[in-house]
Curated annotation (Swiss-Prot):
GO biological process, one term: response to redox state
DNA bind region: 17-56
Annotated source species: Clostridium botulinum (strain Loch Maree / Type A3)
Designated gene of the protein: rex
Protein name, entry field: Redox-sensing transcriptional repressor Rex
GO CC field: cytoplasm
Length: 210
């Protein structure tokens, strides 16, 4: 069995943070770092870092620490960044446009191919050369193009309908910004970003400290 399939979701959710911090270290020409030093920067314990990384192999050397470039490369591979991904955004409102304007996606290998919306005032416009198409063409577009991930940025009432179209056209990854928990088959991966949930978590923590 693939070892990665047995990795806990908690470890998986920490990997992007490792990747981001290692990228910053590379930009600052840091060649190596110990788990203790990484702990001070990233906020996890040194023991936790070693345990997490040991899930995927032996990356460090006692007395030397981690080679930053090599570790960043290995975590990139674990995260699947050794392959490019074609993406579409459904919903060209504020959130959709913000995502389309986020230039780091392309640096990570995520290629936003096009956007879809129902608003006649938006259809035909381009955001950073990304064209906004009529959502009525979503199914036919998916039939003709190789798309890996669909990003849903539509209102609550339309999100499940959009998800159904994505699933029907064999999209296996959905990044969902709509405030609804989608119903999809088990072989489709959904990552929810409910903005209000994050804000409510913040207010809870604020009140907890008072």
């Amino acid at each position: 069995m693939d070892k990665k399939k047995n990795i806990s979701m908690a470890v998986i959710r920490r990997l992007p943070k490792y990747h981001r911090y290692l990228y910053e270290l590379l930009k600052n020409d840091v060649d190596r770092i110990s788990s203790k030093e990484l702990s001070e920067k990233i906020g996890f314990t040194a023991s936790q870092i070693r345990q997490d990384l040991n899930c995927f192999g032996d990356f460090g050397q006692q007395g030397y620490g981690y080679n930053v470039s090599e570790l960043h490369h290995q975590i990139s591979n674990i995260l699947g960044l050794n392959n490019p991904y074609n993406i579409i955004i459904i919903g060209a409102g504020n959130i959709g446009q913000a995502l389309a304007n986020y230039t780091r996606f392309s640096k990570l290998g995520f290629n936003v191919k096009t956007m879809f919306d129902t608003n006649p005032k938006l259809i035909g416009l381009k955001i950073r050369e990304i064209e906004i198409l009529d959502i009525d063409y979503l199914s036919s577009y998916l039939e003709k193009n190789n798309i890996d991930i669909g990003i849903i940025c539509v209102p609550h009432d339309n999100a499940q309908k959009v998800a159904n179209i994505l699933v029907k056209n064999d999209i296996k990854g959905i990044w969902n910004f709509a405030p609804i928990d989608l119903s999809v088959p088990e072989d489709v991966v959904v990552e929810n970003v409910h903005l209000s949930d994050s804000l409510l978590t913040l207010t809870c923590l604020i009140n907890k400290t008072e």
